[in-house]
């Protein structure tokens, strides 16, 4: 019991005190709240997710979510009430843009049928579709299907882009920003969601690109094996200037929250055989075509494209462990 109490105290420990006039803004992405436990996880995933959200809410004045707060757009009343209880406890702190999982068919006019829309309508969450000001800073949203040409240019290089976009993803160019886009747009910082993998910061002219990765680990991608769970904190006194830092959220090692089979598979990938890149898999899957009579068999299509057997086996296993039908 004492050990459990210590863990809880460590998890909710406040950050180092800052001067009272400093506002702290947390940026996270791809929370993927879900009611059903991912098959690869051995813990109570929903509770783990809510604990992370409470941690960032307690340690920051505001929390900005760069898309995909929920894993599916329409959830049960029980899940809504559970999330509502947490968000209402920290009412006024939550800001978000929509991700592709948050809405029905990416339709922003269907918020009344989405769980995230319910949070918005009861006043627990601010959803943003236009630039908004927060603590003297301007944040500009870009959704997954926003054309980069429609994103306003930051001529003064002082604003912050919050986008649910890949970065130069050849599999999904319509859902991506490129380095040329970033140079043209001219934002001081650009935070991208959508891609769950964490990357090092990159710099394009005067723009700092941040792709921190998802707040949660929901699958068996190899990058989930050893990575830290983090958020970015922006600190400002309200004068338009700010500083930022990468902050680690308390989390359990993958070996403690994944089932043994999933963890062993993640450990083996890349050790005994060449790691299968999901970008490469995406290039293969993009060649699938729909016909009037139905959808081509994934297995037959992969074999017709001379996909290596070990790659096919890995794709099949990832489908099964995540409860996705493989045909």
Predicted features and spans:
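Non-catalytic terminal accessory segments
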Residues: 2-10, 254-327
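Beta-strand-turn-beta hairpins that frame and shape the catalytic cleft
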Residues: 18-26, 131-141, 155-160, 204-208, ...
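Active-site environment of divalent metal-dependent phosphoester hydrolases
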Residues: 32-35, 71-74, 97-111, 146-148, ...
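Metal-dependent catalytic neighborhoods of phosphoester/phosphodiester hydrolases
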Residues: 37-40, 67-86, 103-122, 201-205
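Conserved catalytic scaffold of divalent metal-dependent phosphoesterases
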Residues: 83, 95-181
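Conserved beta-sheet core of the metallophosphoesterase superfamily
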Residues: 173-240
